[in-house]
């Protein structure tokens, strides 16, 4: 299965290059037969939504889920993707997050579009080298997409 109408709606306003990568990654994901669907959790964010997410774990209840008020989501240069089965996100399944990372990096390489993953902030191919891992997050790097 590829992207749903809901996923495509969530990609509205996202930079076309990133949409190209996500669409190709979804096609690759579908061939893996993981039993999980790939969903677009979030694309473009409003400043209000970003402020609410930033407050989480700081001045509002919950755990910290973002480290900046200057998110690439605000400009349509980022997406959050999640593997889901029976309505449940596979948060604890490292293998699925690694598979998603591989799908995205393969799709980006094929399209010759640079991406930065929340699992690999410095883009060196080594995932989770920092404590601020954000497995669902993929963005177009500022140095290529100001």
Language model features: what each stretch is:
Residues 1-42:
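Active-site acidic/histidine clusters and adjacent loop/turn architecture
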Residues 20, 48, 99:
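Short, well-structured alpha-helical interface segments that form or flank functional binding sites
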Residues 26-60, 110, 120:
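Extended, low-complexity, intrinsically disordered C-terminal regulatory tails
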Residues 57-69:
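Cytochrome P450 catalytic domain signature, combining two hallmark sequence patches
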Residues 68-146:
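Catalytic cores and adjacent binding grooves of peptidoglycan-active enzymes
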């Amino acid at each position: 299965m590829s992207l749903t109408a809901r996923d495509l709606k969530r990609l509205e306003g996202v930079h076309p290059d990133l949409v190209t990568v996500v669409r190709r990654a979804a096609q690759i994901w579908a061939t893996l037969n993981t039993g999980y669907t790939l969903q677009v959790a979030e694309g473009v964010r409003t400043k209000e939504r970003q402020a609410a997410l930033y407050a989480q774990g700081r001045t509002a209840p919950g755990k910290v889920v973002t480290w900046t008020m200057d998110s690439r989501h605000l400009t349509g240069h980022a997406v959050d993707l999640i593997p889901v089965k029976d309505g449940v996100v596979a948060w604890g399944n490292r293998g699925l997050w690694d598979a998603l990372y591989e799908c995205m990096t393969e799709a980006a390489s094929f399209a010759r579009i640079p991406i930065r993953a929340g699992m690999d902030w410095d883009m060196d191919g080594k995932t989770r080298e920092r404590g601020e891992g954000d497995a669902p997050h993929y963005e177009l790097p500022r140095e290529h997409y100001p």
